[in-house]
A protein has these predicted regions:
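Extended glycan-interaction surfaces of carbohydrate-active proteins
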Residues: 1-79, 111-113
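Non-catalytic C-terminal accessory modules of carbohydrate-active enzymes
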Residues: 52, 83-186
Length: 186
C-alpha cells in the first residue's frame, strides 16, 4: 500500500513524477483493486485489528497470485496513515472516487461511536502518521506555495478551499469567473 510514498511526497512538494506516469497510475489502480476490502467480517488477521466486522479499509499488502510463505509483519492490517497516503496518491492520479472511498472508510471507522475521531491509533494513540490526512486538502485544492518565488497556486475547479503557507492561512473561493482569497490570519 505504501510502495509509492516517494511519489506521494514528490507530488506534495510540486516535484512532479519520479517515474513513468502510466506505471504509477497502474500501480494505484492495482492497490485499490487488490487491497481495498469492503467487509472484514471474514478476514483473518493474526496481529492488531484496526478494522473489524463490516468495516472497510485498505490492507497493508495483498497477494493476488498467492501469499508469501513468510509474509512481513502487519501485512493483513489496515493503518490510517498508510491508507491516507495511498488515497492522496489516488487523488493525484485522478482517481477521486476511489480516494474518497478510502478516506470515507477511515472516517466511518472513527465516527466517534466506535473509535475516537481525534485519535486514529496505529502504534499508540495520537500517532503522527495519520496526519497524512491533511495532504488530501493539498491534493484536492492543488495548492502549491513557494517562499522563493513568493507565489501561491490553487486549482481552477470551482469550490471553497483552505490554504496555509507557514506564515498565514485562509480560504480561497474559486468560481467560474473569479478567485477570492481571504487571509484569516497572518
Amino acid at each position: 500500500v505504501d510502495q509509492l510514498v516517494g511519489q506521494y511526497m514528490a507530488h506534495l512538494c510540486g516535484l512532479g513524477y519520479l517515474g513513468d506516469k502510466k506505471n504509477i497510475q497502474t500501480t494505484m489502480k492495482s492497490i485499490m483493486k487488490y487491497n481495498f476490502v469492503e467487509d472484514f467480517s471474514r478476514h483473518f488477521n493474526n496481529m492488531r485489528s484496526y478494522v473489524m466486522g463490516d468495516e472497510a479499509g485498505l490492507l497493508m499488502a495483498s497477494w493476488p497470485k498467492g501469499r508469501l510463505e513468510v509474509p512481513f509483519p502487519y501485512f493483513s492490517e489496515v493503518m490510517t496513515g498508510f491508507e491516507y497516503c495511498a488515497a492522496v496518491g489516488m487523488l493525484y492520479e485522478g482517481m477521486e472516487e476511489d480516494a474518497l472511498t478510502c478516506i470515507n472508510a477511515i472516517r466511518r471507522r472513527h465516527d466517534g461511536a466506535k473509535r475516537n475521531p481525534f485519535s486514529e491509533s496505529e502504534c499508540g494513540h495520537h500517532y503522527a502518521r495519520s496526519m497524512a490526512s491533511w495532504s488530501a486538502i493539498i491534493a484536492l485544492s492543488e495548492f502549491q506555495y513557494s517562499g522563493v518565488d513568493k507565489s501561491m497556486k490553487i486549482t481552477d475547479r470551482p469550490g471553497n478551499y483552505f490554504w496555509s503557507n507557514g506564515y498565514s492561512w485562509g480560504t480561497v473561493q474559486v468560481t467560474e469567473d473569479d478567485v477570492t482569497i481571504e487571509v484569516i490570519n497572518g
